[in-house]
């Protein structure tokens, strides 16, 4: 009995590692950039692949464990990732806005550098969003199969998991709807 509790609680390590990896990516890039000044043999290109690697780990966990993860656990994993990455995307959006505003400085080269930085940060952010999607898509599909959410809402929710800001809004809506469904199920069970 204790082994199942440990196994079920261990699933939460994966989204926490994903969130930590996303937050540590800029720090590791900065540290490797500082180390590169002192030695030429340090490559920081692998750090940019971190969202892809962590996203593949998320996908592998969801595909391998599949039915062993409950709907509630999938929702908690989704909420951990989506809610914890709100400050990350907020700061990324601010950096993009600053990069785009730098286009209007009198330095001519910034006309080209500002949009390049903005596009690069947007791609990294979207890859992070893509890497966070396996848990949320698995939750939405499972909830639809169990009758918690309708098919139309589920289709829209899956589509919007790949758009900034709307993904978090849909996770909030789905979590509230799941809570209401769970309360209704408890009432029916008690009667």
PLM ranges: what are they?
Residues 91-136, 144:
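Membrane-proximal helix-loop-helix units in multi-pass membrane proteins
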Residues 156-176:
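Hydrophobic, aromatic-rich membrane-embedded alpha-helical segments
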Residues 35-41, 67-80, 144-151:
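Membrane-interface helix-boundary motifs at transmembrane edges
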Residues 75-94, 155-163:
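Transmembrane alpha-helical segments of multi-pass membrane proteins
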Residues 171-191:
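Membrane-interface alpha-helices
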Residues 8-25:
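Alpha-helical transmembrane segments
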Residues 58-80, 100-108:
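Membrane-helix interface/capping segments
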Residues 43-55, 82, 121-129:
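Alpha-helical transmembrane segments of polytopic membrane proteins
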């Amino acid at each position: 009995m204790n082994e199942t509790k440990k196994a079920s609680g261990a699933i939460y390590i994966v989204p926490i590692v994903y969130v930590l990896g996303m937050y540590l990516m800029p720090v590791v890039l900065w540290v490797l950039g500082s180390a590169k000044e002192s030695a030429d043999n340090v490559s920081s290109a692998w750090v940019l692949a971190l969202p892809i690697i962590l996203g593949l780990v998320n996908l592998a966990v969801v595909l391998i464990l599949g039915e062993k993860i409950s709907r509630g656990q999938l929702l908690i994993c989704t909420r951990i990732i989506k809610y914890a990455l709100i400050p990350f995307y907020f700061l990324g959006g601010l950096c993009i806005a600053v990069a785009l505003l730098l286009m209007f400085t009198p330095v001519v080269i910034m006309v080209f550098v500002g949009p390049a930085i903005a596009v690069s940060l947007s791609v990294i952010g979207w890859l992070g969003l893509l890497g966070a999607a396996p848990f949320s898509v698995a939750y939405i599909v499972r909830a639809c199969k169990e009758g918690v959410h309708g098919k139309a809402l589920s289709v829209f929710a899956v589509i919007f998991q790949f758009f900034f800001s709307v993904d978090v809004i849909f996770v909030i809506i789905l979590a509230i709807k799941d809570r209401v469904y769970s309360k209704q199920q408890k009432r029916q069970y008690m009667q």
